[in-house]
Amino acid sequence: MACRLFWASRVASHLRISVAQRGFSSVVLKDLKYADSHEWVKIDGNKATFGITDHAQDHLGDVVYVELPDVGHSVSQGKSFGAVESVKATSDINSPVSGKVVEVNEELTESPGLVNSSPYEQGWIIKVELSDAGEAEKLMDSDKYSKFCEEEDAKH
């Protein structure tokens, strides 16, 4: 657990954000927005970077493949644009916001495990140019996402 907290503080420092305190074991970073399908998004002007949350990667297990869209592909909020395959399951990746893909994390082709080891830093999946910045307001902040995960975990 101490190692995870050190990792979280290092990532938060790199992203210039703070770590939310919560009652479950996944790392949730403040200043990011979260979808109920367990994707995170960091908005920077009219650009957004996103990936899957620490909570999602923890439940998936070791990621062995990430299906990435092509640059120029349009993504829509709540719609699938790719998939993450792990030793346990294959899961769709849904877009937390709408936009046009401007960059994909090519490192995931050779090192899909970055999604596990560094979901908020090296394991980001795509960057988009936003088509509707207001969509981010529909997403959860870190406190709501933490509570959502706690409630979801309590059901299982």
UniProtKB/Swiss-Prot annotation:
GO cellular component term, pick one: mitochondrion
Localization, UniProt: Mitochondrion
InterPro entries membership: 2-oxoA_DH_lipoyl-BS (IPR003016), Biotin_lipoyl (IPR000089), GCV_H (IPR002930), GCV_H/Fam206 (IPR033753), GCV_H_sub (IPR017453), Single_hybrid_motif (IPR011053)
Transit peptide, start-end: 1-23
Single GO MF annotation: ATP binding
GO terms of biological process kind: glycine decarboxylation via glycine cleavage system
Residue(s) carrying N6-lipoyllysine: 88
Cofactor(s) needed by this chain: (R)-lipoate
Predominant subcellular localization, coarse grouping: mitochondrion
Residue numbers of Phosphoserine PTMs: 131
Record-linked PROSITE patterns: BIOTINYL_LIPOYL, LIPOYL
Ranges where the Lipoyl-binding domain occurs: 47-129
Keyword annotations: Lipoyl, Mitochondrion, Phosphoprotein, Transit peptide
Cofactor note: Binds 1 lipoyl cofactor covalently.
Top-level taxon of origin: Eukaryota
Function as written in the Swiss-Prot or TrEMBL entry: The glycine decarboxylase (GDC) or glycine cleavage system catalyzes the degradation of glycine. The H protein shuttles the methylamine group of glycine from the P protein to the T protein.
Self-association and partners: The glycine cleavage system is composed of four proteins: P, T, L and H.
UniProt record similarity statement: Belongs to the GcvH family.
Protein name per UniProt: Glycine cleavage system H protein 2, mitochondrial
